[in-house]
Amino acid sequence: MSPQGLTAQTDRFQNQYQSGYFLLEGRHAEKKEDEIQTIYLDTGRFAEWDKGFDFYAPQTFIDQKGRRILIGWAGMPDAEYTNKETLQEGWQHCLTFPRELILKENPYSGEPQIYQKPIDEIMKLRTGKCIPITQKTTQFENECMDLLFIGLPESFVIEIADGVRIVYQDQKVALSLTEECGSGRTIRKTTIPVIETVRILVDSSILEIYLNDGEMVFTTRYYKKAPGTLLRIDYENVRGLAYPLQAITVNDKTRNRTV
């Protein structure tokens, strides 16, 4: 659901509008949709799909493999920040990468929650060999990357494109963008007790950041000035993997064309 009017808190509901879900239990979970008349829900149990700047009005469906897939709108209506760089090219928003939704117990809280992970088909977009990330500064030629970091310390900084920073310290994670890179986007932050893995899908103007295999996700548009993908790491014993990605190809059989 995508409610409007939730009061912003220190680490929740920081966007103009929110998107998220409630986990229903007992008799409500067992009823069919047309049997449910009125349910009173506590907003304290409302779980946001995404903690970043640009995520709204997601849709889900069941695919041929029986997976529940979510695709979100990477944009935020009535936000203070803009997409002036793409507006100059005649377009503004885009869609997120399809995410598989998995309901399971959070090992840190012991509570059930929905995890999100990029669908496995992303592996078909990987080109060339896997590139180990062992240096604190790495420049990739490719605009689109699939980055994975493991063995993370209790505090760390990951910076992309000279302007997007992911900072984790004292169980607080923050995503911040400079004015030049963020086009008005500033900072989004929240609490997470442990971060063991960080996966980042890098496209030319959108980042999707998955923490702990999808326990928490941040999505943001960004606008870099230099080609390729610049990566800076601020912690010791860097361990990561990088996969260059090619574009998604869509076969339009109705018009006999590929886009």
Describe each region flagged by the PLM.
Residues 20, 28-259:
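Beta-rich accessory regions
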Residues 1-35:
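Internal metal/ion-chelating core segments
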